[in-house]
UniProtKB/Swiss-Prot annotation:
The chain crosses the membrane at residues 61-78, 80-102, 160-182, 300-322. This is Cobalamin biosynthesis protein CobD. InterPro entries: Cobalamin_biosynth_CobD/CbiB. The lineage of its organism: Bacteria, Pseudomonadati, Pseudomonadota, Alphaproteobacteria, Hyphomicrobiales. Pathway: Cofactor biosynthesis; adenosylcobalamin biosynthesis. GO terms for cellular component: plasma membrane. One of its GO terms (biological process) is cobalamin biosynthetic process. It is a multi-pass membrane protein. It is found in: Cell membrane. It comes from Brucella suis biovar 1 (strain 1330). Its main location: membrane. NCBIfam families: cobal_cbiB. GO terms for molecular function: ABC-type vitamin B12 transporter activity; threonine-phosphate decarboxylase activity. The keyword Membrane applies. The keyword Transmembrane applies.
Length: 327
């Protein structure tokens, strides 16, 4: 375990300060893009609307299981090869883990929304936020754009960083690869619309299971980071709102980090949202909080995000040092 903690510590630092170099991924496909292509291929070949719902559910289940198994196998193969490469193998493992984390890329995309609102007004904000959320941005005002960016930041703090880190510690590279496949499948086919309701059902449920612990850990880390940065009362407020409102969210997991961010920032988040022609109803988290969010609230959310990531990284580094000296 101490080796995985050291690898994760270095990967978190590498991802934080370097992130995903655009020039690299312009030349080769990012691993998540490759996962997406595999899922897209399976969806095109096995999600036939003429089939009965039970068959679609079965097809979606076997596609997801098959791809997860392939990811686990790939992780096992790479894990068996790397030790024979010595120091180079250790460096490669750190780089692989860093590539599958998303601290800097997530923060950069969210910061772009705040900057677009300042520079180009509502139209710029809508365009920027459309890069990170699936909802229809055309009907969003400045408050809606800002809330959408903050909600995406909170949810993806779990999905994009805490959960991959958690599953790497649990299962090494096979666990990390499997999680990234599950999460990518959920984002692509785990929707409650006519096209994916049956075919993507298994992927969505599996993602709920995979993110159950990480989502709650993310909320707790955000509340603790708030306490460390703004005092115990602010931290208690974030924790209280999270425990009270997290289950109001339509997702069994996203509500935990989103409610923690809502309580920490004094904002009302979530609520009704538009996905294409579909309106998804839902209550607000921290309903008495500020609803007319703006660019400076995105800035505050980014400060909270980085505080949360710093806390997690510090805990991982501390655990790795304890493992080295005690073990």
């Amino acid at each position: 375990m101490e080796i995985k903690l050291i690898v994760l510590s270095l990967a978190l630092l590498l991802d934080r300060f370097i992130g995903d170099p655009p020039l690299l991924w312009q030349r080769i496909s990012h691993p998540v893009v490759l996962l997406g292509k595999a899922i897209s291929w399976g969806e095109k070949n096995f999600n036939d609307s003429s089939l009965p719902p039970s068959t679609l559910r079965r097809n979606g289940m076997w596609l997801t299981v098959g791809l997860v198994a392939a990811c686990i196998f790939a992780g096992l193969v790479i894990r068996s090869i790397l030790p024979h490469a010595g120091t180079a193998g250790a460096i490669v493992e750190v780089v692989i883990v860093a590539i599958l984390l998303a601290q800097k890329s997530l923060a950069d995309h969210v910061q772009a929304v705040a900057q677009a609102l300042r520079d180009d007004g509502i139209e710029g904000g809508r365009k920027a936020v459309s890069m990170i959320v699936g909802r229809n941005p055309d009907r969003l005002d400045e408050g809606g754009v800002s809330r959408a960016a903050i909600e995406s930041l909170a949810e993806n703090a779990s999905d994009g960083i805490v959960a991959p880190a958690f599953w790497f510690l649990v299962g090494g590279l096979p666990g990390l690869f499997a999680y990234k496949l599950i999460n990518t499948a959920d984002s692509m086919i785990g929707h409650l619309n006519d096209r994916y309701r049956d075919f993507g059902r298994f992927a969505a449920k599996l993602d709920d299971v995979a993110n159950y612990i990480p989502a709650r850990l993310t909320g707790l880390l955000a509340a603790l980071a708030t306490s460390l940065g703004h005092g115990r009362e602010a931290g208690r407020q974030a924790l209280s709102i999270m425990c009270r409102d997290a289950r109001l969210h339509r997702s069994p997991n996203a509500g935990w980090p989103e409610a923690a961010f809502a309580g920490a920032l004094g904002l009302a988040l979530a609520g009704p949202r538009q996905y294409g022609a579909e309106t998804v109803e839902g209550p607000m988290l921290n309903a008495t909080g500020k609803r007319e969010a703006e660019a400076r609230d995105i800035d505050a959310a980014l400060v909270l995000f980085w505080s949360t990531m710093s806390l997690m990284t510090g805990l991982v580094i501390a655990a790795s040092l304890v493992g080295l000296f005690v073990g």
